[in-house]
Amino acid sequence: MLGGKKTGGMNVYVRDLSRALEAVGVAVDVFTRSQDDCAPRVVHDLGPLARVMHIPAGPERPMAVGDTEPYLGEFVANVLDFAEREGVRYDILHSHYWLSGLAAEALAAGWGGTPIVHMFHTLGAMKNQIARDASERAPQSRLEGERRVARIADRLVAPTPAEEVQLVELYGADARKIVVVPPGVDLAHFNPIHQLQAKQMIGIPPNRKNILFAGRIEPLKGIDTLLEAIALLKERQVTDLSDTCVTIIGGNPWAETLDEELERLQRMRLDLGLDDLVAFAGARDQQILPYYYAAAEMVVMPSHYESFGMVALEAMAMGTPVIASEVGGLAYVVRDGYNGFLVPRRNAEALALRIADLLGDHRLRQQLSANAMNYARDYSWARIAQQILGVYQAVAAPSPVLS
């Protein structure tokens, strides 16, 4: 599911990288905390050489990421037991997110110094720079954990040169250990579909223009800026919105108890008089997501911070232009005026103008669409996996078995 409470780009990254590595003969074991005691402990759905292991650690139910830290020791012990029972030896530990980096450190010690490759995906120090209040700030334990992982990892994978600089300046990371490798996109899955076919598939009238947001419902995604921009367009009548809808993919708008941010955004929609324009569609399965991208005239990513922004690549692969905040990885993925537009973050005025530009100019949308598809081809997972494999080979023996 995209836009679910505990899902996002990192899960997609791990899944697709594992499949791409498996496709070139690398054996991959993915260890994750079990969230369901009825689920199989070992799942073989990433390919013949790839497995997903659900490891008990704490209550076997979904938990907020921050609440899993006390169970890190139990997780490590159970992974060590599993590997010993299976008689498996790993040549590389590739950890994702800071807690997994700490787990990798303990596992490496248990296995006699297995090299660690780490990718943070998001940085607590960067989130804190744009946090509006204490509730949005990363805790001190995370910042200290990230500094430790930056120090002990043999290689750090940064998705952009911007994060490479942030790792050095904010965490004191050794620049010689950092390699820049962007995420990829599944070009077979995100393969262009005719827009009319896509609209029919998801129930959007053929003559209706669609503005799409896809992602988790959380403050740093800047969805409130999108709502403010649409309200400006409606108020000023800069462009005709009578044939336009805004679809927000993410969260669960039908839950008995709404997520705090989702509740705030729904109130905001009503206060701004946008209930006839904006629809909260909830999280959507990855299988149907390409149709939403293809049905949209544009994808809007008004984020306050993005380490990379895989949604932008997925949209471009479908031929959909992206309007994004000029922050983090989005500033590298979106080429202003080529495959989309960049706007200052938290600037509803600038965002409204760019939305109006795309809504009102079919020829411009076509040009950006063609450019976006060409651009996305450079990010195939086959190509990215080769770059990651090069990182592994630099720190370990040939023919690695990965965890």
What spans do the regions from the language model cover?
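A conserved catalytic-core segment of Leloir-type glycosyltransferases
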Residues: 7, 12, 20-90
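Short alpha-helical donor nucleotide-sugar binding micro-motif in glycosyltransferases
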Residues: 283, 291-296
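Aromatic "clamp/platform" in nucleotide-sugar-dependent glycosyltransferases that forms part
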Residues: 304
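A short, well-ordered alpha-helix in the C-terminal region of glycosyltransferases
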Residues: 350, 357, 364-378, 394
